[in-house]
Amino acid sequence: MQYPEPIAKLIDSFMKLPGIGYKTATRLAFFTLDMEKDDVTEFAKALISAQRDLSFCSICGNITEDDPCDICQDPSRDQKAVLVVEDSKDVMSMEQMKEYHGLYHVLHGVLSPMDGKGPEDINIAALLTRLQKNEAIKEVIIATNATPEGEATAMYISRLVKPSGIKVTRLAHGLSVGSDIEYADQMTLYKAVEGRTEM
């Protein structure tokens, strides 16, 4: 049976989200149709507002309403350390821990030759430029996920940064192989930051 075009379009739209297959997208589409009109309107407004009002910080690449972001503008942050993460969700996870007080740099991905992602496809050049311009930075803490792509990205960044004399460290692996930072509990993250090792 074919669904009416508006439902089919809604299903297709939900399937564009990561991890959402046809069955889940269909369930979400019908759930949306059962929602109150006001709730659907608020949901649509929230999507449009997020797309319109958010951008990436020109310094660290984190998602923000203001440029530069609040973290980059905060003079109380430790200006000597930059924690390099894969995406903005990782920044949120680290901030919830409330134990790391340095700066961040968001890569927006990892090196993945299988997916055609090279160094030019992620935010590495901006990191190198930032390190050259800001002599206050003394340590780069690499916090990419414990996946083969995350490890390859960490090694690549380490090779580029080390010749500059800046200390390069890697989060300790209380994080199990294949795990994502955004899903780690706060104690695990705290121990990973505290136990970081030099690369």
UniProtKB/Swiss-Prot annotation:
Q: Toprim domain spans which residues?
A: 80-176
Keyword annotations for this protein? DNA damage, DNA recombination, DNA repair, Metal-binding, Zinc, Zinc-finger
| Record PROSITE patterns | RECR, TOPRIM
- The highest taxon in the source lineage is Bacteria
- Disulfide pairs here are none
Q: Fetch the SMART domains from UniProt.
A: TOPRIM
Q: Start and end residues of each C4-type zinc finger?
A: 57-72
Q: What Gene3D superfamilies does the entry give?
A: 3.30.60.80, 3.40.1360.10, 6.10.250.240, RecR Domain 1 (1.10.8.420)
Write down the InterPro entries for this protein, in alphabetical order: DNA_Rcmb_RecR (IPR000093), Rcmb_RecR (IPR023627), Rcmb_RecR_Znf (IPR015967), TOPRIM_dom (IPR006171), TOPRIM_RecR (IPR034137)
One Gene Ontology MF term: zinc ion binding
User: Which GO terms of type biological process are on file?
Assistant: DNA recombination; DNA repair
Which Pfam families is this protein grouped with?
Answer: RecR_C (PF21175), RecR_HhH (PF21176), RecR_ZnF (PF02132), Toprim_4 (PF13662)
What family is reported? Belongs to the RecR family.
Task performed by this protein: May play a role in DNA repair. It seems to be involved in an RecBC-independent recombinational process of DNA repair. It may act with RecF and RecO.
Q: What is this protein called?
A: Recombination protein RecR
What's the gene? recR
